[in-house]
Amino acid sequence: MQPFLCANWRQDHSATRCLGAGTKGCTGCHLVMYCGKDCQTAHWPVHKLDCKNPMRKAAWRPAWEVENRVPHFIDNSDEEHTPVAMHGGSKYLWGNVPAFDLLQLKDNEGEDYSRDLSLLLAASGDLRNLVKTIVSLPGSYRGRIHIDINDRDETVVARNLVFLLVAFHLPPDVASVAILHLWYSAFLPESLLQSVRGAVFPAISEFLAADPVQAASVLQKMWSCRSSTLSAALSRTEWDRVLSYLPEAPDISYEKAAALHESITLAHSRRDYRDRALFPLHPSWRLSLWKFRSDGILLPFGASREDFRVPNPTLFHNEHPWPMPDSADPLQGWTLTEILRPSYGAKHDLYGQLYVSLKRNLHSFCERLHTLKLSICLFKQDAMDLPDKLATLRGRETFYDRIELANIADLGYLGPAKTLALFGPLLKARNENPKATLIMLFLNATREMSTPADQLASMPRAMETLQRFLPMRPRHGDPKNKYNAEFLNQMSAADLFTDNDTLFNRLVERARFRDMGRLLGLGMKIHNSIVAKWPLRLGDNPTQHEFEMAFWSGHTGCERYVEWHRVG
């Protein structure tokens, strides 16, 4: 990993930019690094605006408290500030639960296992689970892995294909940085975008020119990278749309794109929602989050942004508005405690830590594409149609060692019965692989099963426990104010202490999980072996640090995984 450059640079170009390595962190905020005392002193007039920012003070309070009013996420008397669940676009281009290794060979087939494997990601969203799985493979693995990746969203599929083509066609040190910024940064350096376009555009346009088929006809194209292959089966129209995500010139100016981005991520009408998210965080984390929301560029806090002037065409597509809700956050797709492992000196630079972690993982992922035997196939289908479409395309059914279904089994989507009936038959038989596993995620089940009586019954215990972790601080704010930030903080954290097992068991009984499984020759695992049943839930007798990691992650602890295996 290359060292980070000294943070002594200025946006107005009024000073010469230091090209030395950043080795000395600011001890005030731990957000930036310098090559030495001279540069730190020279940069202080600029850095003090961040280091002394009121948001970094322990006494900082949200605007609704300072202005002594009802927060906008509660008040519905003003049309502009009517509480809504979402502001911004409706696409989910960044994961909202942490990535996990789909194989976990050590705890399943065994660390020395080297037979071929087949994986299905039926509603993949982004590529985080693929990346996590590939980088977690034991170095001794010698088999071939076949991976089918599907999503119904055009933008998700196009971005995933572009990222993988970059990994196949550019050296790992270049590809890893390019994928990172295409994935998470609103703006890119011109040189990076041209490298990507030069690698990806001809790979698609040349084969389309040689095969002029009708718009609805499915075209399959395969690329090779040493012993790995990448293919996609898309209609001609869908292939053309992939190319539209890499235009020769930007569809939109930097100024207009920045305004569109800020209209979602920094909307005035949503300031109370932002303050509610910022308030619980470590003071320097607040500023790291604010900077990312402000400029939309995933870099260390002190890194220069001056080259990042081209709108990311996979996010600003055909002059469309910012495609994601204002709650979208790259951090939610990764495990916070893994991101925060010591990696560089600016220890409170939260998004800088994420940058370091992602760059390392993506570099490893790109390297392993060159050494493993992988065959990756991309599809754009509704999950409900996917099994039939795959069988038609291949002329046979494909059976899998792992089937990952995201949360399509939630009641608001396909539901558990239909999901299991569609994908359960695709799991390999016990005599082929007794460890074959189908993985369902339920994000909304406990909320859907909870009644007002449940909520009333659980609140006293939750609030009593929370006094230990989130005590009211009478020196800051008015504790008698029912909209006191500490009190609302406690209410937000109460989900972490809810009896979710009881609520989820209601769904298991009402939806007749066991009966469904029995009909299909499947059973729910008593002990999950791929991903913990409640991976984001607090354990018994948590420490203050464990509570803070869970609360600051932005997750509720209600996320429940169910693993199914062949029985009988």
Language model segments and positions:
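Domain-level detector for long C-terminal conserved domains
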Residues: 2, 46-120, 124-568
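The −1 position to Zn-ligating cysteines in a subset of zinc-ribbon hairpins
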Residues: 5, 25, 34-35, 50
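Cys/His-rich Zn2+-binding "zinc-finger" mini-domains, especially FYVE domains
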Residues: 1-29
